[in-house]
Every structure is written in C-alpha cells, then in structure tokens.
Amino acid sequence: MATLILPTARAQNNASIHTSWLWHLHQPIYWPEERAGSDHYENAWDTIQAQGAGRSHPVEQVRGQVFDIDDRRAAYQCRPHDALASIGQYVKSGAQLNYSGALMENVQSLGAAGQLGYASNWYQSNKDAKGWTTSGGKSRVDLTNFSYHHALAPFLSDETLEMELRIHKRQMQLLWGDPTSHGYFPAEACFSERMIPILNKINIAWTVIANNHLARACSDFPLVIGSGGENCDLPNRADQINPAQGAGNYQRLTIDRGCSPTSAMPFSFQTHYARHVDPNTGTESKIIVVPSDQALGWKDSYSTWDLGLLNGLNARNNPNKPSLVLLAHDGDNAWSGGYSYYMEWVPNFASQ
C-alpha cells in the first residue's frame, strides 16, 4: 500500500499521520443474458447494440447514461494515472485503484469496437502507473483484488468466493501484468472473518474494512443511534472485546446521509490482525485489516474538506504505530469521479 505522509500533522520527529486513497471503479453487466452465438453473457457493447436495435431492456440506456460520459471515460482509462502524476514530487505518494472484473469486460468491449471514446489500449495508463514506484519501492498504483462481479463476499460459498477472486486476479494479470496486489477491497466494505482462509489461500495479505467495526467492538464504545449517531447494526456486547479507548478518544462526524459514524482515535486508524479459527479443526487463519474511515471517506467523495478534522487524530498519533487515514470511495461517481476531484483536489490535498 502506497501512502502519503500528511504535512499538516505538526508532530515532530517524523511522527506524522499517513493518508492514502482507494478509488473503486465498477459498472455491472447490465443484461446478463447469453449473447447470441456464444456461451458468454452480454458486455456493454452487446447491450448498446441491442438497445439501438429497439430492445427495451435494461431500463438504463447503457450508451447515454452510463459509459458515454466524459468523466467516466477518463476515470476508466487515464485519470487516476494523471492525478498521481500531478503529485509525483511527493516521493511516498500513491493510491489504491480497485477495478471490477465486470467493468474490465465492459470497457474492453468498447475499446475493441472503437466505441464511445474508449481506446483499444484503454488499460495502458494504469499499467504505466503501476510501474511507478515510491521511495520505498512500492507501486504508486496498487491495483487491488476484488470479487469479479461485485459479489458481496460474506454471502458467497467458499468455492464461489475463491473463483470470483481468482478470475479477477487472472484478469488483472492479463491487463496489467505481474505482480498482482496482496490487498483486497470487499464490495460495499462487506467483510467477515469467515473469509480469511480463502483470502489466505490466494495470497491476499491485507483487506480493507470499515473502521467503525473496530470502534464498535471496543468495550466502552459510546453508542448513539439515530440521525446523530450510527446507522448500522447495534454492537453485540459479546463482540466488544477490543480494549476500552477512553471517553475522550472517540470522534463522531456527521455526514450528509443523516448519520454520524464514530471512530476511535487512534485505534480505528491503525492496522490490526483479524483471525478466524476453524471450529472443527482449531486451525487459525490471520489477515491484516486496513481500516477506512467512513465519515472522512464520504466527505472526500462529495467536496473538499477541512483537514483540520485530522487534528484530534494527529494529537493522539503513536509514531511507533502511525495512524493511517484511508479514504476509500467510488472513483467514478459523484464529485470524486470528476476532473475537479482528481486534478484539483488531489494535488491540493497533497500539498497541505
């Protein structure tokens, strides 16, 4: 994982907090019917042609409402590359890019047909950026693993999850080459420790999780429900086995969805190990969990935001286990899919 050491953190002796982004890109297979004359489902160009010939489904006009939008054309081909090029003077800077398998197929179909402004080598900019390295020798664009069709992993059988991950990894190899990432972004941040043995099996070493799951499992989590608090399942007291953090070490930030996610500082901004123990054999599997902040990720998706919101975390930062603010969100929707985000806010953020 490539990170940016945030200069706004004013602690001395290189005790700054770290920041990074994960930009998630996805479009589904809009009409998964078998393509005429083949054993494969339709991709974007197939569906566009069928709609152009008068077919009424799917409801979405895949040409005009989905792929034929300038910001998406750029996001799916070159804009993450361009954004990171704009901050190349920061030698530790980088981001994670999460590109679904379904989107790869859709864009590949448009590029192969020379349609809607997609090039046959649409993948090249990401491949080039993957070859850039930080001062620590890490790829500046870490193209992370994902369930190929945006499947919600905890609801899959072990066999299905393994196959979704393997075909996604293989598609990344074909487009962007080896080595593939050791990281994983779960669709909709849906994670369960039951998945850990499968992730281990295919050489995934770390996974993103929503950091409110770390906070809500602390024994002194200050639960507030409703519009001023959580909008998720209430914590099970039997799961609250993370250490107490102290009343002054929780931060509750309001976002526009009518809730206020709560984070523990610095606990839910630090990496941890999660484990799964097979109840039949006692075999233990472990994985590193990398927390993404729910409130700050939301804010980064929709507008510029005041980096002073990180002051409380910075004051509690442990230089022996530095805090990481991971801003994980869509890179092709809302404000964070546009030029102003990638080419203005990203360099502005990095310079502060």
Predicted regions and their residues:
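Short catalytic/ligand-binding loop motif for oxyanion handling, primarily in non-cytosolic enzymes
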Residues: P28-P32, L103-S109, A151-F155, F191-M195, ...
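Acidic, His- and aromatic-enriched active-site or binding-groove loops in soluble protein domains
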Residues: Q115-D142, R166, D178, N200-A274
